[in-house]
A protein has these predicted regions:
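N-terminal presequence-like segments and the immediate start of the first folded domain
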Residues: 1-137, 142-343
Length: 343
């Protein structure tokens, strides 16, 4: 199956990353598939082998799907084990593979701390600070499950907060997604950038409380911290001419909207994203924003067809990807992330 998928990909030298979405049976199969993916990529692409990430989420429209990223024209690059460095005019960027723990059956906090330790070493080796991270994906097995009064997502948030405590976030946190997977433990992907010749700003949403300012009442589970720590991310970031839209759900202020079906939540979520990406909300001069990708996570597979119908009718020309995944609050049925270009 991987061979057939790879044959559909342009094998140009500037291939940066392949993210595979597929549902394995369990953690053992996930580990086997991940090893096979890395070996197959090296065999098929040779010296131009891209970074890889394997997300344990089923696709709605196929048994396996891939998102493929290319290095922009004119950007020099260095391939390393587990990450790639991009060098442009006045900036350096670090793109990671999907970083996984050695033991995906360990506790969520232990896995998260191990991954953040790996990430810290990658960044430090090339002079990046933790606060240079501008986009982060956090895939968390059984994200809303509670073990011994501790919610998996809150365990991750506490580990992330401790990692982030070592950095100066005066320019805002990364854009981020925290989403559930069926298995595979914790997996994190990161984009980081440093340099003076680049636009890089946080974007707030006028209709939402910043996630890092949430009150204790919307956080779940027991914690070892003095209090439960908040999810440390911004609603979006603009880097260059690209707006990176964080995982967004039907939340106004800090409270989930009481909408009992996925299509209604999808419509409200896209209205919230419109507020976020409105030209008068972008902290740099622009006359228009244009979506270039919308990735939709759907909690219940039996609601997928209606969600797809809604999105395809409203956004027919935008590339879209539909996945089945649990969202960070039990009452939320949809989460949408994406990218947009400013004009």
């Amino acid at each position: 199956m991987l061979q057939n998928l790879f044959e559909q990909i342009d094998t140009a030298d500037n291939l940066l990353k392949i993210t595979i979405f597929h549902l394995p049976a369990d953690n053992e199969e996930y580990i086997r598939n991940l090893c096979q993916l890395k070996e197959s990529v090296k065999e098929f692409f040779g010296s131009n082998a891209p970074l890889t990430a394997y997300v344990a989420q089923p696709c709605v429209t196929a048994s396996m799907a891939a998102e493929v990223t290319y290095i922009p024209e004119g950007v020099e690059y260095e391939r390393h084990d587990g990450y790639t460095l991009l060098h442009g005019d006045g900036f350096c960027e670090l793109i990671t593979q999907g970083i996984t723990p050695t033991t995906p059956s360990a506790g969520i906090r232990q896995q998260s701390e191990e991954i953040f330790s790996q990430l810290s070493k990658m960044l430090a080796k090339h002079g990046f600070a933790i606060c240079d991270i501008y986009r982060q994906w956090n895939y968390i097995e059984q994200i809303t499950t509670i073990h011994n009064e501790r919610q998996n997502y809150q365990e991750f948030n506490d580990a992330r907060s401790r990692f982030y405590n070592n950095a100066d976030w005066s320019n805002g946190y990364p854009a981020a997604t925290g989403i559930g997977t069926s298995c595979g433990g914790v997996m994190i992907e990161v984009f980081a950038i440093r340099g003076t010749n680049v636009v890089n700003h946080a974007i707030d949403n006028p209709v939402q409380v910043a996630a890092h300012n949430y009150s204790q009442k919307v956080l779940t589970g027991k914690t070892d911290e003095a209090q439960r720590t908040t999810p440390k991310f911004e609603r979006a970031r603009i880097v260059g001419d690209v707006v990176y839209i964080s995982g967004t759900a039907a939340i106004k202020g800090e409270n989930s909207l009481q909408l009992d079906n996925a299509t209604a939540q999808t419509e409200e979520t896209m209205n919230i994203i419109k507020s976020l990406t409105a030209t008068d909300n972008i902290p740099t001069e622009c006359t228009a924003t244009e979506y270039t990708l919308l990735r939709t996570y759907i909690k219940n597979s039996d609601e997928a067809a209606e969600v797809i119908k809604f999105m395809d009718e409203r956004y027919p020309s935008v590339p879209k990807h539909y996945l089945i995944a649990d969202v960070c609050r039990p009452e939320l049925l949809i989460e949408i992330e994406g990218t947009a270009i400013i004009r």
